[in-house]
């Protein structure tokens, strides 16, 4: 992943003499008339509430009135605003900038200029002056299935599958933070998790994110001690033989001597009878204690499992108990009837729980959990994106789509690519196997080969670019040879895209996160649109290539980011994580994007509590990007816009 602090200096400062069009002398956006309404999209006078910010400026880098403009061209903007602003197109838009197209400021600090923005941008002021470092506006860590959003995160593969909580597959309660990625009613047993995994020993896909497993067994040491002591007593009374100097380590400080040390001549007559009586009494007491402990432990477990089927329930147990869930299952019907969900997202990023290799070989993920997830996701979107192929995750998603009869659901396949060629070859082989076995590929929108591989490459970015391009060419050749007609793409930070990478992909897929730019939420939607249109849209103009925002979202809590982490002057500066802020970003972004046809994936549907391990100091947002908690419950206070009943295609 690399130390993110070394990655944040990729944003050149904006020279003071280059005041951007549409901004006042103080660098603030020129305010637009009107106090609460703005015409959006192609329809006449689509009114929005005051939450849709009215301070409007223009998007950079292209002519949004053109037919090839991302987001619908003339139909995707407010015409009244567009006709009052001078615009430059293409490369001309950057002629007076500090740098060429390849070096324009990154998404973390771009002051916009040029044409119009349906999201009413108001980009943040760049912290550093012309002669200062631009470290304050930074890139973010990869969001792929298990990567942390903070540099505090341990390397992939460093965590082991943890214990699950004691909640039912049927209840919606939040399970423990140490319960792994997407620990929504985990079917994994905590009893067998390894205590330690060396990431260097794992042929991994970079997706490991398991936290160490705390023991769920109450009084485990005490129970073992009782068993050891009881075993010793019963062995003595029933003549068991033991090796000399045997140690009963569960007993604190117990290096007990061997039974032979206490051996005595066999008693005769009354002494023997008395010994048997005493022995019987003691044996009865010991056996009673053992049975009582076992019953108590069972009842204690059952008490916790009355409200839950805890982590003791395996994936097979789940299927045996609940069957292979489908659209007619009561539990699925309940999930799909959840209030507050609206299908307004063009796409959703998703990683099933427990699809880390090689852990999944021992603790397979639950098909029913994936089916539950897909039931909820089907209420939010018709397109789901995966990040890898390990652990049958793709097959499970496809099975869930079939069981739920989601005829409109489409899937972007994911292939995890890193510096481990064994991982890469395994992932690609699984991709080919999935597609070669199917004659009907209509459910697939494409295959994404790698996520933020360039960002994670650090100083070897150019080599990583060549490798990603080579992998995409390999995949495309296999598809052509096997008559597989789906798109081949990769995804990376918006500021890592250039013409070379764009030429090799069928779709430019950029991850754009205003939160990590320290952008105030009231300006975040416009800033996102402006960045995307300046950095990524020009790369596909005049071509038939697609252009998608592969990740965009906002955390529901955990602090605030001022462009260089949590180093803010107070807790209200910069990008503030919170339910209120998430709601505002959705209000400003979701419906206008739906109206003008902006294609994007929301990050993400469900919280990932295992990422709490990556939180540090005042940066406590790693595990809080979901619209819902890990139990598939809409977070209290979260309001997904209904966009007047309009739904995503």
From Swiss-Prot:
GO terms for cellular component: cell surface; extracellular region; fungal-type cell wall; plasma membrane. GO terms for biological process: cell wall organization; glucan catabolic process. Gene3D superfamilies: Glycosidases. It is found in: Cell membrane. The keyword DNA-binding does not apply. Keywords: Carbohydrate metabolism, Cell membrane, Cell wall biogenesis/degradation, Glycoprotein, Hydrolase, Membrane, Polysaccharide degradation, Signal-anchor, Transmembrane, Transmembrane helix. Residues 1-50, 110-224, 301-329 are annotated as: Disordered. It catalyses: Hydrolysis of (1->3)-beta-D-glucosidic linkages in (1->3)-beta-D-glucans. The active site is at residues 452, 551. It comes from the Eukaryota. Residues 144-157 have a biased composition (Low complexity). Residues 1-274 are cytoplasmic. Its EC number is 3.2.1.39. This is Glucan endo-1,3-beta-glucosidase btgC. It comes from Emericella nidulans (strain FGSC A4 / ATCC 38163 / CBS 112.46 / NRRL 194 / M139) (Aspergillus nidulans). The gene is btgC.
């Amino acid at each position: 992943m690399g130390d993110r602090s070394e990655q944040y200096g990729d944003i050149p400062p904006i020279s003071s003499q280059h005041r951007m069009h549409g901004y006042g002398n103080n660098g603030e956006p020129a305010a637009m008339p009107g106090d609460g309404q703005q015409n959006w999209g192609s329809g006449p006078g689509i009114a929005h509430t005051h939450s849709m910010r009215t301070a409007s400026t223009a998007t950079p880098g292209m002519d949004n009135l053109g037919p090839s403009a991302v987001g619908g061209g003339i139909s995707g903007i407010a015409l009244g605003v567009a006709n009052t602003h001078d615009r430059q197109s293409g490369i001309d838009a950057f002629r007076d900038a500090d740098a060429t197209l390849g070096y324009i400021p990154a998404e973390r600090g771009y002051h916009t200029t040029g044409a119009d923005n349906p999201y009413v941008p108001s980009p943040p002021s760049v912290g550093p002056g012309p002669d200062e470092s631009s470290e304050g506006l930074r890139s973010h860590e990869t969001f792929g299935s298990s990567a942390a959003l903070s540099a505090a995160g341990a390397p992939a593969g460093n965590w082991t599958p943890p214990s699950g909580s004691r909640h039912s597959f049927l209840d919606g309660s939040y399970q423990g933070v140490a319960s792994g990625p997407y620990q929504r009613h985990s079917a994994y047993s905590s009893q067998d998790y390894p205590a330690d995994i060396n990431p260097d020993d794992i042929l991994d896909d970079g997706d490991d994110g398991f936290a160490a497993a705390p023991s769920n067994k109450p009084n485990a040491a005490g129970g073992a001690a009782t068993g050891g002591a009881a075993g010793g007593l019963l062995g003595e009374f029933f003549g068991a033989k033991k090796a000399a100097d045997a140690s009963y380590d569960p007993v604190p400080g117990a290096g007990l001597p061997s039974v032979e040390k206490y051996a005595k001549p066999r008693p005769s007559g009354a002494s023997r009878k008395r010994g048997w009586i005493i022995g019987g009494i003691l044996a009865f007491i010991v056996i009673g204690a053992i049975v009582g402990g076992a019953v108590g432990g069972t009842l204690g477990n059952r008490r916790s499992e009355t409200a839950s089927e805890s982590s003791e329930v395996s994936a097979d147990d789940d299927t045996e108990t609940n069957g292979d869930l489908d659209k007619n299952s009561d539990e699925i019907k309940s999930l799909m009837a959840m209030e507050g969900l609206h299908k307004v997202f063009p796409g959703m990023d998703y990683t099933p729980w427990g699809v880390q290799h090689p852990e999944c070989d021992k603790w397979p993920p639950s098909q029913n959990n994936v089916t539950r997830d897909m039931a909820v996701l089907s209420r939010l979107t018709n397109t789901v994106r995966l990040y890898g192929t390990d652990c049958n995750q793709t097959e499970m998603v496809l099975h869930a789509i079939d069981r739920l009869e989601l005829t409109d659901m489409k899937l972007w396949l994911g292939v995890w690519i890193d510096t481990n060629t064994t991982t890469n070859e395994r992932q690609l082989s699984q991709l080919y196997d999935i597609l070669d076995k199917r004659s009907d590929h209509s459910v697939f929108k494409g295959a994404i080969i790698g996520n933020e591989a360039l960002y994670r490459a650090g100083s070897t970015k150019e080599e990583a670019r060549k490798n990603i391009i080579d992998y995409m060419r390999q995949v495309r050749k296999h598809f052509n040879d096997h008559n597989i007609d789906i798109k081949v793409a990769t995804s990376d930070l918006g500021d890592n895209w250039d013409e070379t990478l764009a030429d090799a992909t069928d779709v430019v897929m950029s991850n754009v996160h205003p939160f990590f730019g320290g952008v105030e939420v009231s300006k975040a939607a416009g800033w996102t649109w402006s960045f995307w249109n300046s950095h990524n849209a020009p790369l596909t103009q005049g071509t038939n290539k697609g252009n998608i925002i592969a990740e965009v979202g906002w955390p529901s809590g955990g602090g605030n980011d001022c462009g260089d982490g949590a180093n803010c002057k107070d807790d209200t500066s910069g990008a503030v994580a919170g339910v209120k802020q998430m709601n505002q970003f959705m209000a400003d972004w979701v419906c206008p994007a739906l109206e003008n046809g902006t294609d994007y994936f929301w990050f993400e549907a469900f919280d990932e509590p295992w990422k709490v391990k990556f939180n540090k100091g005042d940066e406590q947002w790693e595990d809080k990007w979901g619209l819902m908690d890990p139990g598939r419950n809409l977070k209290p206070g979260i309001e997904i816009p209904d966009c007047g009943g309009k739904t995503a295609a």
